[in-house]
């Protein structure tokens, strides 16, 4: 009697071969006889026109305007001149008293009001209103404050932070500078996991370029307002994506979450008010 084999048994017999030689011979013979005499035929894969699957997606995405990923695939990541030609650092100038498309943001409150009107929320999962976090950090008393960019994404198959950091380093730096000016911070920190060497290299290179061009340093674009940035590589611990664990890691301690309150916006890095935003 021929032992019936199906697709799953074929896979098992190829990967989990019997230990005894005679059983191997018998299994192989059964497999060959099954293929020779079986009447079963494999079902061909079903094919659909592309518009059946892609049309609804295209209808949803086509009407959207890209913001964070604007000029995707068009702009060279490390080309500062191209970034400026496409409007880069214009909003930063507007926050320093300049004008962009007839608009200016002369005060920190006007920046926060604009963010509140936009409805911008955090992308870390909780969806906390960004304007509220900025407002709390700005109102927190203290001689020194920090801005931290959380680039430590640990979700399997998630590369949002990686894509943004690798593709738009100047855009992320500009956003950090604006955040620092708004909340009153003088130092920014990029916390990027070491598994993203290209992201680390591009952000580090972009920081050096911005320092040379006057966008970072003791006087941002000659405004007299200082802002310095450094890059820290994370060791890859999933828990360090949580903001209090991230701060503990920055302080050289074990990356473990702590109870809140106080929140980092009130008492964060080195006991100072700290704004932690996702990339």
Each model region followed by its residue ranges:
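Feature of Fe-S/electron-transfer and energy-metabolism proteins
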Residues: 8-279
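Short, exposed "boundary/linker" segments that immediately precede the start
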Residues: 1-6
